[in-house]
């Protein structure tokens, strides 16, 4: 278990996430907040959204309304600097669950004004013409990273990166930048702004050696327990590292693993009970949701959703409902 007494954050630090477009992301953002609160109860959290603030009641310190009409979807993150109420910000996608204290992430970016976690490579598949990119943005390497996590401080350097990214964004098609699922992708633009600022990606590890990586660990086995703070990846029977968080991208949002962990978080925060009997019941319910492809816990956060879960569990126990 992690020693929570070692947690430390920069002054004015907080965590930011964005929820728009898909309403199920509201419930995922709440699951994200719960996973953070388990280990960082005093770290301020903010959500920027165009949904009803009541969906986030009690879990976020700031619920910030925002107009997303100019954005296709992912590219709304180019507004992160303007959105954040914090002096030092960790941005996390709503479909992430956190397994360790985020103090490790602050350690990773200590001294930085802006940062991402990934790899510095010579060629990127994000652009139709690397020759064009090299002419416009000459560099030996380019940052390859997943946009599930960003770090930035309120500073001239970070402000300049986001300002430059906005101007590059206007040339998205001219620069022959590929879209992601028909939407413009912010990390492909921020990558180019980082080149001009001379900023490289951090490797997936912090000062204490934990993996900070928003890419899903393909080909690895993951042992995870969000309530106990366990997230270990192994490959061919060998431990490859302990992860600070997992990013349930794409179809992983509706996977059994995500459903089960989210249900456990909801149950623990609402009822404070845990144990093998509860886990067994929640495993059955998560399997039911996954097999039916009806993520019922996503439909609506609040009393209705919890009552549905409670009623379903009672039915499975043969106790009827009340």
Feature locations, PLM:
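N-proximal low-complexity "stem/linker" segments adjacent to membrane-targeting elements
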Residues: 1-27
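Active-site-proximal specificity loops/subdomain of glycosyltransferases
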Residues: 50-84
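Short, hydrophobic beta-strand segments that form beta-sheet elements in well-ordered domains
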Residues: 42-51
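GT-A fold catalytic core of metal-dependent nucleotide-sugar glycosyltransferases
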Residues: 73-126
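A glycosyltransferase accessory/donor-loop signature
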Residues: 2-12, 159-322
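Conserved catalytic core of nucleotide-sugar-dependent glycosyltransferases
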Residues: 108-168
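Short, acidic, metal-binding catalytic loop of nucleotide-sugar glycosyltransferases
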Residues: 35-43
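Conserved hydrophobic/aromatic beta-strand scaffold that supports enzyme active sites
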Residues: 80, 149-151, 245
């Amino acid at each position: 278990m992690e020693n929570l007494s070692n947690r430390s954050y920069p002054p004015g630090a907080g965590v930011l996430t964005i929820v728009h477009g898909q309403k199920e992301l509201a419930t995922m953002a709440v699951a994200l907040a719960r996973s953070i609160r388990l280990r960082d109860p005093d770290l301020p959290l903010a959500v920027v959204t165009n949904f009803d603030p009541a969906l986030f009641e009690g879990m976020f310190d700031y619920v910030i309304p925002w107009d997303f009409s100019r954005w296709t979807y992912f590219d709304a993150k180019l507004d992160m600097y303007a959105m954040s109420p914090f002096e030092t910000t960790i941005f996390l996608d709503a479909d992430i669950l956190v397994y360790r204290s985020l103090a490790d992430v602050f350690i990773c970016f200590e001294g930085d004004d802006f940062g991402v976690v990934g790899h510095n490579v010579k060629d990127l598949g994000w652009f139709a013409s690397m020759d064009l990119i090299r002419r416009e943005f000459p560099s030996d390497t380019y940052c390859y990273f997943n946009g599930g996590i960003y770090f930035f401080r309120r500073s001239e350097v970070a402000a300049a990166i986001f300002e430059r990214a906005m101007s590059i964004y206007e040339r998205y098609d001219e620069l022959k930048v590929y879209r992601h699922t028909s939407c413009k992708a912010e990390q492909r633009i921020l990558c180019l702004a980082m080149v001009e600022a001379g900023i490289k990606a951090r490797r997936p590890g912090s000062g204490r050696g934990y993996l900070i990586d928003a890419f899903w660990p393909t080909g690895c086995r993951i042992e995870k327990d969000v309530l106990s703070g366990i997230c270990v990846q192994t490959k061919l029977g060998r431990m490859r590292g302990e992860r600070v968080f997992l990013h349930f991208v794409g179809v992983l949002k509706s996977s059994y693993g995500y459903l089960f962990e989210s249900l456990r978080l909801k149950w623990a925060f609402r009822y404070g009970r845990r144990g093998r009997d509860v886990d067994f019941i929640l495993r059955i319910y998560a399997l039911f949701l996954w097999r039916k492809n009806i993520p019922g816990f996503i439909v609506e956060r609040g009393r209705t959703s919890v009552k549905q879960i409670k009623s379903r569990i009672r039915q499975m126990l043969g106790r009827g409902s009340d």
